[in-house]
A protein has these predicted regions:
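Short C-terminal domain-edge/linker segments immediately following a structured domain
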Residues: 38-40, 60-63, 108-112, 144-146, ...
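SAM/dcSAM-binding transferase cores
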Residues: 152-203
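C-terminal substrate-binding/active-site "lid" region of AdoMet-derived donor-dependent transferases
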Residues: 89, 95-168
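A generic structural signal for alpha->beta connector loops
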Residues: 26, 51-53, 108, 139-140, ...
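Generic surface-pattern signal
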Residues: 66, 70, 136, 182, ...
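The AdoMet/dcAdoMet-binding core of the Class I SAM-like
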Residues: 1-107, 121-122, 155
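Serine/threonine-rich low-complexity intrinsically disordered regions
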Residues: 10, 49, 53, 67, ...
Length: 203
């Protein structure tokens, strides 16, 4: 695929940057993480593929996002993958923060938010509402919900990816996302995501 500009908020094992370098060589990637030792350890133990264009920033994700916006930086994708759930940092959630991240997108950009939650998915329900509010304010479609189908049917614990951005409203996008997995995959459009949030509130 063609190179893209991606902002990763949360480094982890740098798995996604490696994948992007393999599938979209030449992509410009910025990784922000507060844990300097984690990033250094990962790079020492698992060096990035040759040619990877990656800038590592040690900073709070929200402060870094604000600085990038002030500098006029824009990205084709912003990926928020920081420990979430009820115990996560409160300033890295909610409609205002998601709105700040949406402002960092190019016209064709997409925001992806990885959410881990306990059984009942009450945190997910709250964040669905928050991202819906932020997307409406920014004038972009969202949120879409991507997860294991059984998990959402049972309101079971696990990980969910929420997405918002102009390209998601294009014809055939839901089908392409479902084909990508996990299988069986649930890909909920904004109306279906709102219905899921309502079901969580009633449970």
């Amino acid at each position: 695929g063609a190179p893209v500009r991606v902002l990763h908020l949360g480094a982890g094992a740098l798995t996604l940057p490696r994948y992007l370098q393999a599938t979209r060589p030449g992509s410009e990637q910025t990784v922000v993480d507060l844990d300097r030792e984690l990033v250094s350890f990962v790079l020492a133990e698992l060096p990035l593929p040759a040619g990877t264009d990656l800038v590592s920033v040690v900073a709070d994700a929200r402060l870094a996002a604000v600085d990038l916006a002030l500098d006029g930086e824009r990205f084709d994708a912003v990926v928020l993958d920081i420990g979430t759930g009820e115990e996560g940092a409160e300033h890295l959630r909610g409609a205002v923060f998601y709105g700040e991240l949406l402002e960092l997108l190019t016209a064709g950009g997409v925001l992806l938010v990885n959410i881990g939650d306990d059984a009942g998915l009450h945190f997910l329900g709250a964040e669905l509402g928050a991202l819906e509010e932020a997307a409406a304010e920014a004038g972009v479609p969202g949120p879409w919900t991507l997860a294991d189908q059984g998990m959402l049917e049972r309101l079971d614990w696990g990980n969910v990816v929420l997405a918002a951005g102009a390209p998601l409203g294009e014809a055939g996008c839901t089908e392409r996302l479902a084909a990508a997995g996990p299988h069986p995959a649930a890909v909920l459009d904004p109306a279906e995501s709102a219905a899921l949030a309502a079901r969580i509130r009633r449970a």
